[in-house]
From Swiss-Prot:
The gene is Rfx7. SUPFAM superfamilies: Winged helix' DNA-binding domain (SSF46785). It comes from Mus musculus (Mouse). It is found in: Nucleus. Transcription factor. Acts as a transcriptional activator by binding to promoter regions of target genes, such as Rec8, Mxd4 and Ddit4. Plays a role in natural killer (NK) cell maintenance and immunity. May play a role in the process of ciliogenesis in the neural tube and neural tube closure. Interacts (via PxLPxI/L motif) with RFXANK (via ankyrin repeats). Interacts (via PxLPxI/L motif) with ANKRA2 (via ankyrin repeats). PROSITE patterns: RFX_DBD (PS51526). Residues 1-27, 303-347, 404-428, 482-590, 634-659, 688-716, 918-1016 are annotated as: Disordered. This is DNA-binding protein RFX7. GO terms for cellular component: nucleus. The keyword Metal-binding does not apply.
Length: 1459
């Protein structure tokens, strides 16, 4: 059989060969036989076949050939025709065993497509359809598919088809619903047999014909999709793309002066309802002219969401049909650019195309802004994008105002839009909401906002008086009308009116879209009526047309485009009318700058700065740039103007958009931000180096700043400040900048000198203060400004002081750097700089924070990302976000991120964020808003990005992302839970009981404190069944589970804590000495209580003794940390935030984590104990830090929580992590986790050791030993507490992020232990510049990576270690321009670990940080350190004795992993 089977092929080959041989020209015959092959190849093939056949068969074939040679040609032909074909019997039998062949499937596929069509009102019986198919196959001799396979093909052809059972009872049949037979069946196209022979002639024609048919089919399908999408977006039916294009042109959604528009309009009368294909082609032509615009517009808005959701075809379609995307995009951007900075030059097709790329947002708004604009702008209507229909140009003034108001929400919307479908819905509503209010409020100013964006820049056509409104930025619409911004401000926090409304605006700044709510908190603070707050929005990504490459990236990356939109929206400048003339100049200058700089920064809108006269002391240039794009792309920053009424030019450079897009368009939801953040960080570091990333459009070309930028490269934080100036010099933008600057100078020399640029470098929010005169504005001025600015006094005293301090050093970039580092340790460094930048923009940040972390989420996250550690943290969330599979996970992720980011920022930000975050849940909180928001942005730079509950761009999380459920209970509650002490303090009572505050019962509000809280009794019983989504949220893992939609059954105890226990917990927290914590005490205690109870019932398979010992540790820790109780509080606060998490099935573990390595490490299969551990070590860490920010703010006074957050978040987080670990994780794991903790702990130790470690000499060893917390009894407990404190920073999983946070935390902690201890009060908030300087010294030490392990352990260098880690992280970030990438890797790794081992990756390694880089050196030192070895041995012993039987018995993989 085998021989026979193999005979035919050789025969076939040979027979043909024979013909050629007999023929004079055999060469010709062979090719004919094998048409595609030349003679040599055919021979080679023949030899190959021959060699593959056995000798006997070859001999047989040779014999046959010899006989065949005797045949005549006719006989040979007959033989050839008679040769058997098809499969051999053996192959046939095999084939039958198979389900079906590709050919059969194709036959069935073609038959189904040619015979059936969709029709919503008819159904076809399945059997009838299959019988027809079978008869068709029988007629043609095909082998029919089985009924099951045929059904699968049917599903592929008609994915929307559903099976229904129709008919009377007893006679029902299964039918395909929505199908019918085609009335006319087209003749199937047959392949062109002459294809090869014809050569070029026919070959070109035939294929082109076929391709054309295919293209037409695809194009028509794409057109259908686009029309369907347009109908949803515009609430108006479109049968063809031509109709849609006509509508878009008619309603001025796009420019009317382009050839495509003219062509469409000319063709419209003839037949609006043209054939779909023609309509498709028309759009194509149209798209060519409009494409840039179209592309740009869609990316920022719903279009993106829609596209993402829809098939790629649709995306192509959108690009094809610029009108559609343009419309959608225009719609959103227009609404966004309320400032009347309609960037779209209506009459300017050429400009339009570049503009769209660079500035999606601006393009849309331009039509609406002004009558003048209207002429220019083709799409005036877009302003009303919320409605889907736009107001006509005629409503220019009102529209513009509406836009500016709307803009704020819009931008956020845009941001969300780019990341996910959730954006579109959000977009729509916010659009609709802002429209009415905005129109009424901002109508007056609208004229100023003339959009000249049609060209990348160009001056505003608006009168000088309206200069302030005018935005020069080509992409950014920066004309926020200062007229009553109250309502508008609410709508668009970013649009803070110059008037007193600014204050309100600060409060309002809730981000409607998760994307960004940049508010001009400062502006509002500045309550100077002239629109003192100039909102300058620089969207780096939007950048200028100049940055086409970048823009392209942005376009390609949806995130980026939205970012641009946001920028346009946010780029609203409120300038006092008095300064109008200058602003206009500046505006132009800025535009030029943008052009000059390839950077993404739009020309800064100096206009705002011009307000100087109006600003007087109050005026703060509030750059409310909201991160329109996903979370990070850019954050709005507001810089308070100098005392001398100078609005610093805050330039928001969002490099992140570009990077971020690349990093994660994903989702990004926030996820995209990660990479961008890293990149941004890198960009910040190397402002000049990365044209795309760096938005060098620094207002002030300060050579001194150049140095700063260099330093910044090392330390992303630093970069933010320093870069601005030097980059300007470096970059072409310089002249433009200079021009801008003169404007600024005109306004006020001091103001000029300190150009405050709010840059979003990468994810980092950079407020670049550039001073034209090197020293003229610098520290003193800055300090003055900070002090003068209302924002400082109002709520953000703490932050402002820090800011001041940093600013004071600003002239000296290094000094600034130093101060920053000192302030925050390594993380603080970044943050500090951001702080400096943000200080002025604190109100904005506050607002953003207020806007429930939306903006902070994005902007701050960026900030943190800038700082290395923070970056890591930030990115983890993003990774998680990218990974997240479900909405729930997304929400959890967001919460996690929020908490984590908050904690990051928090650590960096002196815990101001804490308060801010607190506000996030209650963005409305006006009183706290300014301070809390301020803090929040600062501290939760990273936070908001991932989990911007308010309007998470990436995820649609409720504003109070911090605590969706119990966490959300009350902003104040979450705050109190979140108080820094709360976290760490939590450890004392609750952690003692639970072994870790993270173990707090999920249901309990305090459960946030215990990120690692056992998921809940239910979860404990079946960790896999109900793993908290946020389990890997670092601190808040468990808490998220508890606070989120946890079923009541899940946390029965949480709801009814013992009064005794509550009191005990409260006392413990209060005892920590943090009034704020005490205020929050109940919540934390509640959490602890619940935690304790859950813990006991759950037991997490962790021996009770382990549990007890851990509680002991926590208690001791508490006692030890008492002096630094704020730190502990911070931890608690962090927990609170995390608590927001939802309890979700385990599978979500990895995907949902937004917060840090820990977040990634949700344990899926690991026993509850492991899970707890994980939460503690990996997730808990960051979230703890994060939460504190948000939670603390609402509680009591924003100030205290802030302080607590600063000092406590990191240390507490670490301590808690360790405690939890020891409690529920095997020593091995703990050891592994602890090492990084110990290292970072040491970093933190500097301050902590001073305060606490001084008493814990042995504790230092234990800081390393902390790995095996279970180790011991009271002595160990005390050590454990210390280790927790120290380890907080070093936890590997979140080592980087935590390090950054911890460093800052420890710095502040030590600096202002009294503050920490104090009850909430402004005192805490405002750290004196002296403290900051001290911190800077510490920071310098931290920078010293060479400090030995012992030094770190000693506690003097605790911060040093942190700093080193942070530094390494920043270096890594610099090295890997895409820090987020690395982070993502880590995240993926952690995810893998989670999935594989359900082990906390933190235990194994720190995904949050580039592994082995920063930590490895320290780790090596530790390994060599006798203390460390001792600890390790003790840990191991304790592990064996601790009773990790659960690991042995339940989690073999875990044990193996540990081993």
């Amino acid at each position: 059989m085998a021989e026979e089977q193999q005979q035919p092929p050789p025969q076939q080959l040979d027979a043909p060969q024979q013909l050629p041989l007999s023929a004079p020209n055999p060469g010709v015959a062979l090719p004919a036989l094998v048409p595609g092959l030349p003679g040599t190849e055919a021979n080679a093939l023949q030899h190959k076949i021959k060699n593959s056949i056995c000798k006997t068969v070859q001999s047989k074939v040779d014999c046959i050939l010899q006989e065949v040679e005797k045949f005549t040609d006719l006989e040979k032909l007959y033989l050839y025709l008679q040769l058997p074909s098809g499969l051999s019997s053996a192959e046939k039998s095999d084939q039958n065993a198979m389900s079906s062949s590709r050919a059969q499937q194709m036959h069935a596929f073609s038959w189904i497509r040619n015979t059936l069509e969709e029709h919503p009102e008819t159904s076809l019986p399945k059997q009838e359809v299959y019988d027809e198919y079978k008869s068709y196959c029988d007629n043609l001799g095909y082998h029919p598919l089985s009924a099951a396979d045929f059904g699968k093909i049917m599903k592929n052809v008609f994915p929307n088809m559903k099976a229904r059972r129709l008919g009377t009872r007893g006679k029902s049949k299964y039918c395909y619903s929505g199908l019918r037979k085609k009335a006319f069946v087209h003749m199937p196209t047959l392949p062109n047999l002459d294809f090869h022979k014809t050569g070029d002639g026919l070959e070109g024609v035939e294929p082109s014909g076929q391709l054309q048919n295919i293209d037409e089919e695809v194009i028509s399908s794409a057109c259908r999709l686009v029309c369907e999408w347009a109908q949803k977006v515009l609430s108006q039916p479109f049968d063809t793309v031509l109709e849609l294009a006509h509508f878009l042109v008619k309603s001025h959604y796009i420019g009317t002066k382009s050839m495509a528009a003219l062509t469409v309009m000319a063709a419209a009368p003839a037949g609006l309802k043209g054939i779909p294909q023609p309509s498709a082609f028309i759009p194509t032509a149209e798209s060519n002219s409009f494409q840039p615009q179209v592309k740009t517009l869609p990316s920022p808005i719903d279009a993106k969401q829609q596209l993402q959701r829809k098939i790629q075809k649709k995306q192509q379609e959108q690009k094809l049909q610029s009108p559609l995307p343009g419309e959608s995009s225009a719609k959103k951007p227009e609404g966004t650019t309320a400032n009347g900075v309609a960037n779209l030059p209506n009459g300017n097709p050429a400009i339009l195309s570049p503009q769209p790329i660079g500035i999606v947002v601006a393009a849309v708004p331009s039509p609406i802004p002004v009558q003048r604009t209207r002429q220019l702008v083709t799409s005036p209507s877009p302003m009303n994008s919320p409605d889907g229909k736009v107001l006509p140009l005629n409503v220019q003034v009102v529209t513009q105002h509406m836009q500016s108001v709307k803009q704020t929400p819009k931008t956020p919307q845009n941001v969300p839009a780019s990341p996910g479908g959730d954006r579109s819905a959000r977009h729509r509503y916010p659009q609709i909401l802002p429209k009415p209010a905005n129109t009424s409020a901002l109508t007056i100013r609208s004229p100023t906002t003339v959009l000249f964006t049609s060209s990348p820049i160009k001056t505003a056509v608006v009168p000088a008086s309206h200069m302030s409104s005018l935005n020069v930025v080509k992409m950014t619409t920066i004309s926020l009308t200062p007229s009553n911004s109250n309502a508008p401000l609410k709508h668009s926090a970013s649009v803070s009116s110059a008037t007193g409304t600014t204050e309100e605006s600060r409060i309002v700044p809730q981000i409607k879209n998760g994307s960004v709510v940049s508010l001009q908190s400062p502006g509002s603070r500045a309550s100077s009526t002239g629109g003192t707050s100039a909102v300058e929005v620089k969207m780096e990504p939007e950048g200028s047309s100049d940055e086409h490459p970048l823009q392209c990236q942005e376009n390609s990356e949806e995130t980026k485009a939205p970012l641009t939109t946001s920028s346009a929206l946010w780029g609203q400048k409120s300038n006092t009318d008095g300064t109008v003339p200058k602003p206009s100049n500046e505006g132009v200058t800025e535009v030029k700058t943008t052009k000059v700089c390839d950077q993404r920064t739009k020309c800064k809108n100096r206009c705002n700065e011009i307000l100087s006269g109006i600003s007087a002391g109050n005026n703060q240039s509030t750059v409310t740039l909201s991160v329109a794009t996903q979370n990070l792309p850019f954050t709005s920053t507001s810089s308070p103007s100098n005392g001398d009424s100078v609005n610093k030019d805050p330039k928001i450079c969002t490099k992140s958009p570009r990077k971020r897009l690349s990093a994660t368009l994903q989702e990004s939801q926030v996820p995209p931000v990660k990479k961008p953040i890293v990149e941004q960080l890198s960009a910040v570091t190397i402002e000049g180096q990365k044209p795309g990333t760096v938005k060098k459009d620094q207002k002030v070309p300060h050579s001194g700043k150049t140095e700063s930028s260099t330093a910044g490269a090392q330390i992303p934080n630093k970069v933010s400040i320093s870069v601005s100036s030097q980059i300007i010099e470096d970059q072409p933008v310089n002249p433009a900048l200079v021009t801008s600057e003169p404007v600024l100078e005109q306004q006020t020399t001091p103001s000029s000198s300190p150009d405050v640029k709010v840059k979003l470098e990468g994810s980092v929010f950079l407020l670049d203060r550039e001073s034209k005169s090197d020293g003229s504005f610098n520290r003193n001025e800055w300090q003055q400004v900070t002090k003068d600015s209302d924002f400082i006094a109002a709520s953000c005293e703490h932050q402002q002081d820090i800011s001041v301090m940093t600013i004071a050093e600003h002239p000296d970039i290094h000094d600034l750097e130093k101060s920053v580092w000192e302030l925050e340790g390594m993380p603080q460094d970044t943050y500090s700089q951001q702080l400096h930048s943000q200080i002025p923009e604190s109100s904005l940040n506050e607002i953003q924070a207020q806007s429930s972390d939306q903006l902070p989420l994005q902007s701050e996250l960026k900030e943190f990302e800038s700082s290395v550690s923070q970056t890591n943290e930030s990115y983890f969330p993003f990774d998680d976000e990218l990974t997240q599979d479900s909405i729930v996970e997304e929400l959890v992720l967001m919460e996690q991120q929020m908490s984590m980011n908050n904690s990051h920022s928090y650590g960096n930000c002196l815990g101001m964020s804490l308060q801010n975050q607190s506000v996030t849940p209650g963005a409305p909180m006006s009183s706290h808003a300014s301070s809390t928001h301020f803090y929040h942005p600062i501290h939760s730079n990273g936070t908001p990005i991932h989990t911007p509950t308010p309007t998470p761009t990436p995820t649609p999380t409720p504003t109070p992302t911090p605590t969706p459920t119990s966490e959300m209970i009350a902003g104040s509650q979450s705050l109190s839970r979140e108080s820094p002490c709360s976290r760490l303090a939590q450890t004392t009572p609750v952690d003692s009981a639970l072994g870790s505050s993270r173990h707090t019962p999920i249901g309990t509000p305090h459960s946030n404190c215990s990120s690692s809280v056992p998921p809940s009794p239910v979860e404990c019983r079946n960790p896999f069944a109900f793993t908290p989504i946020s389990s890997s949220m670092a601190y808040h893992d468990a808490s998220i589970v508890s606070s989120s939609p946890v079923k009541p059954m899940q946390r029965p105890m949480a709801t009814h804590p013992d009064k005794t226990k509550l009191e005990w917990m409260n006392n413990g927290y209060g005892g920590v000495g943090n009034s704020s914590v005490s205020g929050h005490g109940i919540l934390p205690s509640y959490q602890e209580l619940v935690e304790d109870r859950f813990r006991k019932p759950h037991a997490f398979a962790v021996p009770g003794q382990s549990y007890q010992s851990q509680s002991r540790h926590h208690d001791t820790h508490f006692g030890r940390l008492t002096p630094v109780s704020p730190v502990q509080h911070q931890g608690a606060t962090v927990n609170t935030n995390k608590q927001e998490g939802f309890a979700v099935p385990a599978p979500l573990d990895n995907k949902g984590t937004n917060s840090s390595a820990g977040s990634n490490f949700r344990c899926r299969s690991v026993s509850p104990a492991v899970h707890r551990q994980r939460n503690l070590s990996g997730s808990t860490l960051y979230p703890v830090s994060n939460i504190p920010r948000s939670n603390v703010t609402p509680f009591g006074s924003p100030v205290t929580p802030e302080v607590h957050v600063f000092t406590n978040v990191h240390t507490d987080a670490c301590a808690n992590n360790i405690a939890q670990r020891s409690q529920s994780v095997p020593l091995t794991v703990m050891m592994q986790t602890a090492f990084p903790n110990a290292l970072q702990k040491q970093t933190n130790s500097k301050k902590i050791t001073n305060v606490l470690l001084s008493k814990l000499d042995s504790d230092n060893d234990d800081s390393v030993r902390g790995l095996g917390i279970n180790n011991v009894p009271s002595n160990y407990t005390a050590r454990m507490n210390l280790t927790q404190i120290l380890e907080t920073s070093p936890v590997f999983p979140s080592a980087n992020s935590q390090n950054m946070i911890d460093s800052s935390t420890s710095v502040y902690e030590f600096q202002t232990p009294s503050y920490l201890t104090k009850s909430n009060s402004t005192d805490q908030i405002s750290f004196s510049p002296g403290d900051n300087q001290a911190q800077s010294e510490i920071g310098e030490q931290q920078l010293d990576f060479n400090s030995t392990v012992k030094d770190l352990l000693s506690g003097d260098n605790l911060q040093t270690s942190q700093q080193l880690v942070g530094q390494v992280a920043s270096d890594l970030t610099n090295t890997a321009s895409d820090f987020s990438s690395d982070i993502r890797l880590s995240s993926d790794l952690s995810g893998s670990i989670n999935d594989l081992n359900t082990l906390d990756p933190n235990l194994l390694f720190d995904p949050g940080r580039q592994q082995g880089q920063d930590d490895e050196a320290t780790l090596e030192e530790l390994k060599n350190d006798p203390l460390f070895q001792q600890i390790c041995s003790e840990s191991m012993n304790s592990m064996t004795s601790s009773g990790f039987e659960w690991i042995e018995s339940k989690d073999h993989p875990t044990v193996e992993m540990l081993g």
